[in-house]
Amino acid sequence: MEKLVLIDGHSILNRAFYGVPNLTNSEGLHTNAVYGFLNILFKVLDEEKADYLAVAFDLKTPTFRHKMFDAYKGTRKPMPEELHEQVPLMKEVLTAMGVPILTKEGYEADDILGTIAKREQKEGYEVTILSGDRDLLQLSDTHIRICLPKTSRGTTEVHNYYPEDVIREYQVTPEQFIEVKALMGDQSDNIPGVPSIGEKTATNLIVQYQNLENIYAHLDEVKPPRAKKALEEYKDLADLSLKLARICIDAPIEFSMADAKLENLYTPEAYEYMKRLEFKSIAARFGEEIKHESGPEKQFVLVEDFSEADALFEKAKKADRIGMELLAENGSVTALALCFEETGSYIFPVGGFMTESYIAGKYEELCRTGHAWVLDLKHSLPFADLSYGDTVYDAGVAAYLLNPLKDSYGYDDIARDLLGMTVPSRADLIKKLSCEDAYAKEPENFTRMAGLMAYTAFAAGKPLLERLTADGMEELYRTIELPLIYTLFHMEAEGIAVRREELAAYGEKLKRQIAVLEKEIWEMTGQEFNINSPKQLGEILFEKIQIKGGKKTKTGYSTAADVLEKLAPNYPVIQKILDYRQYTKLNSTYADGLGTYIREDGRIHSRFNQTITATGRISSTEPNLQNIPIRMELGREIRKVFVPRDGFIFLDADYSQIELRVLAHMSGDERLIEAYKTAQDIHAITASQVFHIPLDEVTPLQRRNAKAVNFGIVYGISAFGLSEDLSISRKEAMDYIARYFETYPQVKTFLDSLVAHAKEQGYVTTMFGRRRPVPELKSSNFMQRSFGERVAMNSPIQGTAADIIKIAMIRVDERLRRENLRSRLILQVHDELLVETAEDEKEIVMKILSEEMHHAASLKVELEIDMHDGKNWFEAK
């Protein structure tokens, strides 16, 4: 039998909206419901191997049910705006995929689905109805299956119902299912039902009497008496409810199976939507169909003749703007892509007289023209001798500044966002092949990819600069982000040395401690078990030894860190478990993990990323050296394995309380500024003023609490969050925060102004003009809006601190090189810089660090730096 899939459009879209976390694309469009809908659709189609597909939607106009009962669906809350804006978008996507959209004035989508399903079943089709509404179970039949999907965090499970499945779960047939609903009513649709009859009584009555008509025929026998009385009194409501709940299966719907025939969902038009909405995983389904592009046709010319290449390079030098990409990986250059005119790009592969050094040299020359745009400058620097004096425009970094919320800034992203073009990505064209392999095995696709890269860099350069200027970020781009590329490359190239033998010894020490903790936990619980198994751990803690306060989930007890941390003060075994987890993580992440990153030179060369975080902070990967533990003694000891070269030491310089100092400056709060100007203990002063006690009487606990408030305020902490951090009541936390704002009133005014500005403008800015969009403030969800308010308060402060450390990094690195010193900046961890310092250069490096870090920004309070040295990172910190 051929298969027809029918979808309840609004129902599935609504379910997807609440099942998938909030998503927006670079245009600011909410996309989570559409994304979830498509995932559900493709999951069902993959499993069904359907031949026909159609989607039914409700209209806003009244239906025949409203004529029967004015209050029908009258209790429903309005659709959230974030979902409402996705309904027309969903219809556009389906239309682009060639899927028929069905609506009918005066009828609901359920009626359309019921009519078509029953009709086509009679014609010999196998029908699947996809809906989030259990009311459709009444349509279940021999050849009609009802699929109810459940989506959680983007993962979908589908529950299937034929008549026997309905009977098994609800004890009634599909026909009787609606009789039950007529008795019990339906609050979501405002179907009244019979007052005082709930689901259990309704089910029992229908099981016993089969239907509503038969119940009334035997009303004298009905028990309990309360139900009998209600049925007598509210017969009209029962009859009305049955009519409202029953799906119409003979609606006047014009529908042709030929229109619903599944030919090709993966159309070029649909692919453009997937790219626009930034659904990369869904776009990947389009396979060969997506190897097209929208926009003017471009020519991508492969140039293998040396003389022709030389002439083109000379011509490019005279152009007003150049777009380039050096295709180089794994230490070797494959080709150079170049564009200097709208018609297309030239690709120069390595070969013959065009050696790697020749190609890299030409790239370097063109970069020095001062008007070259590339996609990823840092990636090319191992092959080109460029540095701070060379102005090369990086399109990826520019695109990041314009929208730091995206997860990628590839040429296909930039083409879509800046040029309005849909082009295939690298993965679309050469899959996972390296550039060298792609040129050898897929030369046509490689040439096309390279040409698109160069053209995108060329064409996007002008609009990128114009938008940066319009948004007030051109100076930030030129003076901080572009020079930073060189700084980060220098740090990556230098790396940091790791002693393998000490790393191995550290691992053994951890393993011994883990074994001790494991034995202690077993002894305290009276049983050997797998401590790493949440299921076993939950059963031991909350059932066997009966610890109070456990949270039961569908899969067992929650043993998440936040649950255990609340219980740890009262249960020593839980503190042991938390320690055990810390040590096992240290062992896997660092003792075992770091060794895989040590190269032949004995050093780890981590990657530093400047286009990852929304606030502007630099991140570190492969491995993440910014996440080295500092709270546990054994965690801090991992820093001992990081060592300088012979004849060198480490100098570590750390900004002291930089975010609080930025807060004092940006808020202009006189008391906070004065506290820093007098170089007093800011946390003790806050405790003294908040708790109204003399400074010399502040206790260590009060200072700790004041410190939590000080730093919490920077992150927009709520009373609930502070109460959790300090293990105090929410009322006490509210009092702390209120007193803090009484003490520093301009801080409150400043933070409120940030939120107000973000609500009005949609973004906040740092002291240096960096923008951070805050789309969460537009959400109809309270939790999302609250998160948005915290982001609005914190981002200008954290982002300004990030800008300051970037300025310091650039100046320190550039000055070390300018003064021909052997010492090198090798690591940045949030507010901390680590310099591998020649022993005979210690004094001058300390002077450079002090001067450049102090003068990185001019604040109303002085920037303070703590500096230490040592023979390893542990000693220097």
Task: Give short role names for the model-derived ranges.
Residues 6-7, 129-131, 323-325, 392-393, ...:
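Short hydrophobic beta-strand that contains or immediately precedes a catalytic carboxylate
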Residues 437-439, 493, 605-606, 610-613, ...:
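Conserved catalytic core of nucleic-acid polymerases
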Residues 4-5, 9, 15-54, 70-71, ...:
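Conserved RNase H-like, two-metal-ion catalytic cores of nucleic-acid enzymes
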Residues 230, 234-353, 371-372, 433-630, ...:
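Conserved "right-hand" nucleotidyltransferase catalytic core of DNA-directed polymerases
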Residues 153-181, 300, 334-469, 480, ...:
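Active-site-proximal helix-loop-helix substrate-binding element of RNase H-like nuclease domains
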Residues 21-25, 74-250:
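Extended two-metal-dependent nuclease catalytic cores across DNA- and RNA-processing enzymes
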Residues 394, 484-493, 499, 655, ...:
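Catalytic palm active-site di-aspartate
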